[in-house]
Structures are given as C-alpha cells and as structure tokens.
Curated annotation (Swiss-Prot):
Chain positions with Omega-N-methylarginine modification: R205, R231
Keyword field contains Cell inner membrane: no
Name of the protein in its database record: Proteasome inhibitor PI31 subunit
GO biological process: negative regulation of proteasomal protein catabolic process; proteasome-mediated ubiquitin-dependent protein catabolic process; ubiquitin-dependent protein catabolic process
A GO-annotated cellular component: proteasome complex
Region (Disordered): 226-271
Start and end residues of each stretch annotated as Important for homodimerization and interaction with FBXO7: 2-150
Species in which this protein is naturally found: Mus musculus
Tree of life domain: Eukaryota
N-acetylalanine: residues carrying this PTM: A2
Length: 271
C-alpha cells in the first residue's frame, strides 16, 4: 500500500476519531485510482488546487465529510460525502458529469482501531478487505457507469454553416462547366463552302448556308435593319450570326420613295 503511510503521517496530527482515519484511507484509495483532491464542500472555492494530500479543513465537520476530486485527465469529477451513523459510516460518491451515484456502508470497528490513532501500524486492520470494499462499492461502479454513459451519448453534432459561409446573394466562384461554341474560322477560299456537309464529324468548315459576311469574298457592310421601319436594338443580331435580311439590302430605314403617280399599265391585267 505505497503512499498510505506517508499520507497518514501528514494527516495524523489532525486526527481525533475513527471517522478521520477511515476518511484518510478512503482518500488514499481514490487518489490511487487516478484522482486529485480539489477541496472541501459541495461547490468549488478560491482555495481549490489539485493535490494528492487531504485539503485543508478536511475534517472540520465530524458528522459530514465532503471532498471533491478530479481525474488526472480532467474527464471526471467526483463529490464524495461520508456521513457518521452510530458506529459506522455511509459513503456516497456522485460523478458530477453523468450524475451517477455509488454508495457504501462500512462498520468502523471492522477496520479501525481507535485506541491509538497516532500509530499507523495499529490504526488500520483488515486493510486489504477495506480496500476491496471501497473498490467494488465505489470506484468500479462509478467508472463502469461513466463508461456506459459515454458510450450511449449521442455523436457530436457540428453547428450549421453560418451566414458568412452560405450567402445566397454571393456570386459563387465555382462556375459550371458549359459547352462553348467553336470559334468561327473564316474560310481561306470560297470553295470551302459546303465542306462541313462532307465531314460527318464537323471540322468547323463552311456549310451550304452561305454567310454573306464570311463567304471569303470582299465584304460589303450590311445593315441588319434593312427593310424595317426602325433600327434593331444593339445586340439583336450577334456578331457573325447567319441571318436573312428583313428587306431589300440598301433601302432606307425611313421607307420607300414616295412615288405620287402609279406605274404605267398598273391596271392592265394582261400586261
């Protein structure tokens, strides 16, 4: 039982009853199983600190001992209370995170010799049995219940995306892949007209529809609005688009010439 005698020596000057000796042994067993003492009372205090020794004023109340512990990995916190009842003690331990409880009742006469509390070798008797009682009644149940609660806990949920991460008004930087129109290459020869119809895979050569702007002959500026009473809005005819003129090429957009006299023989059906 390494460490118990050293702990007893540090606490012996303040021991005055069998209950003190039993709580000292209980504290040693809890620390041996991977805990630090934090302080006394139900609530944390400004004087709390992690230590393997008993905290100050740990036995100021002989009727009710209240000690708080924290596991070395910080995962579990215990609240231990020992209540004096006639010639025995009722020990209750609460795991603060899961609210799991374990309790144990011990008879003082079975484990403590009250005749000389200053002598370590005479104070405790049946030490192995006492240690087994504490482990099976408190330490093991608390650990098993904590592990079970941890295994049954729901998986961690990630918070939803913030407004900064998802903005419906923000233009996405990822543009969908769209098919692009093949670049129009001017034929180098007027005889290239219709070449695309001979190639089933299409090599971007001219088809049977002749574009007057891309026929290979000297180009003549054509007004797309020819034959219309008003001009087309900008962008109505994309550059390089194939189209049929709306009217005779070269007419004025203001309309035909105002002829006041009918043409000769307009009323002769046999003419």
């Amino acid at each position: 039982m390494a460490g118990l005698e050293v702990l007893f020596a540090s606490a012996a000057p303040s021991m005055s009853c069998p209950q003190d000796a039993l709580v000292c042994f209980l504290h040693w067993e809890v620390v041996t199983n991977g805990y630090y003492a934090l302080g006394t009372g139900d609530q944390p205090g400004p004087s709390d600190k992690k230590s393997e020794l008993l905290p100050a004023k740990w036995n100021s109340n002989k009727e009710l001992y209240a000690l708080r512990y924290e596991s070395k990995d910080g995962a579990r916190k215990l609240l231990l209370k020992a209540v004096s009842v006639e010639n025995g003690m009722i020990i209750n331990v609460l795991e603060l995170g899961t609210q799991q409880v374990a309790d144990l009742t011990l008879n003082l006469d079975d484990y403590i010799d009250a005749e000389d509390l200053s002598d370590f070798h005479r104070t405790y008797k049946n030490s192995e049995e006492l240690r087994s009682q504490i482990r099976s009644g408190i330490i093991t149940p608390i650990h098993e219940q904590w592990e079970k609660a941890r295994a049954n806990s729901p998986p961690r949920e990630f918070p939803p995306a913030t407004a900064r991460e998802v903005d419906p008004l923000q233009i996405s930087s990822h543009r969908p892949h769209t098919s692009r129109q093949p670049a129009w290459r001017d034929p180098l020869s007027p005889f290239a007209v219709g070449g695309d119809d001979l190639d089933p895979f299409g090599c971007q050569r001219g088809g049977m529809i002749v574009d007057p702007l891309r026929s290979g002959f000297p180009r003549v500026l054509i007004d797309p609005s020819s034959g219309l009473p008003n001009r087309l809005p900008p962008g109505a005819v994309p550059p390089g688009a194939r189209f049929d003129p709306f009217g005779p090429i070269g007419t004025s957009p203001s309309g035909p010439n105002p002829d006041h006299l009918p043409p000769p023989g307009y009323d002769d059906m046999y003419l």
